[in-house]
Swiss-Prot record:
Belongs to the eIF-2-beta/eIF-5 family. The gene is eif-2beta. Eukaryotic translation initiation factor 2 eIF2 is a heterotrimeric complex composed of an alpha, a beta and a gamma subunit. It is found in: Cytoplasm, Cytosol. Keywords: Cytoplasm, Initiation factor, Metal-binding, Protein biosynthesis, Zinc, Zinc-finger. Component of the eIF2 complex that functions in the early steps of protein synthesis by forming a ternary complex with GTP and initiator tRNA. This complex binds to a 40S ribosomal subunit, followed by mRNA binding to form a 43S pre-initiation complex (43S PIC). Junction of the 60S ribosomal subunit to form the 80S initiation complex is preceded by hydrolysis of the GTP bound to eIF2 and release of an eIF2-GDP binary complex. In order for eIF2 to recycle and catalyze another round of initiation, the GDP bound to eIF2 must exchange with GTP by way of a reaction catalyzed by eIF2B. GO terms for biological process: cytoplasmic translational initiation; determination of adult lifespan; formation of translation preinitiation complex; regulation of multicellular organism growth; translation. This is Eukaryotic translation initiation factor 2 subunit 2. A zinc finger (C4-type) spans 193-217. Coiled coil: none annotated. SMART domains: eIF2B_5. Disruption phenotype: RNAi-mediated knockdown results in a reduced body length. This phenotype in suppressed in a ced-4 n1162 mutant background. GO terms for cellular component: cytosol; eukaryotic translation initiation factor 2 complex.
Length: 250
């Protein structure tokens, strides 16, 4: 039908706009084509990088960013290789221990742990407690049984003795944790070195004082004397009272 009527229903083409300037016979064209014609051979595309030619027998070496070494050997905060990194407290403490181990290789190893056997406790009758491996623990601590027994009875505030089967019989009802607590206190005071915490020590007596001599670090210090604990007066109260009244009446 459009052909019969002679109509053109297609898209209308844009016509070039021509601007005439007074005094100039040549028309000026506008639009994209005019701009492109004016630029000529000017190329506004991305500039390509030029590749450097490789010569025969030459290897390409990549430049690596230098990393800061640990700051142990540096004398100042800023050394020849650059500034120290910011260390946290834990990292700085690790560096200090590392320097100490490097300067003192003898103390670089782990500390030896001193372990003893647990007390073997059982009932001995209705009012007594048997400590069967008392002498064995004394040998492990390398201490005289008389000294350990004196400290044990003073801390518990009771009486006791070693029977014929080398078993300690203590008056009263006691549990294993109570004997263990007293032995820990004894080890801390009379076995472990007060300077380096080593169990390799010797307990010696000079005049009336006891001294703890360490074979590891060589330190020597005095230890406290054993003091008797609280002792309850159970019997003979009437006799004691009469004796006090008799002395007061005189």
């Amino acid at each position: 039908m459009a052909d019969d009527l002679g109509l053109d229903l297609g898209k209308k083409k844009k016509s070039k706009k021509v601007i005439k300037i007074d005094g100039d016979d040549a028309p000026v064209e506008t639009g994209v084509e005019a701009v492109e014609d004016g630029l000529g051979e000017l190329n506004l595309g991305a500039k390509k990088k030029k590749k450097t030619p490789k010569t025969a027998g030459e290897e390409v070496v990549e430049e690596k960013v230098p990393t800061l070494e640990i700051g142990i050997g540096a004398q100042n905060l800023i050394d020849a290789k650059g500034a120290w990194p910011d260390y946290t407290y834990e990292e700085a403490l690790t560096l200090v221990y590392q320097v100490m181990k490097d300067k003192n290789p003898d103390f670089a190893g782990d500390k030896k742990k001193f372990a003893i056997k647990l007390p073997e406790v059982a009932r001995a009758g209705s009012k007594k407690t048997a400590f069967s491996n008392f002498l064995e623990i004394c040998r492990l601590m390398k201490r005289q049984d008389k000294h350990v027994l004196q400290f044990l009875l003073a801390e518990l505030g009771t009486t006791g003795s070693i029977d014929g089967s080398n078993c300690l019989i203590v008056k009263g009802r006691w549990q294993q944790k109570q004997f263990e607590s007293v032995l820990r206190k004894y080890i801390k005071e009379y076995v472990m070195c007060h300077t380096c915490k080593s169990p390799e020590t010797q307990l010696t007596k000079d005049t009336r004082l006891f001294f703890l001599q360490c074979t590891n670090c060589g330190s020597r210090c005095s230890v406290t004397a054993i003091k008797s604990g609280f002792k309850a007066v159970v019997g003979k109260r009437a006799a004691i009272r009469r004796a006090e009244e008799a002395t007061a009446g005189k």
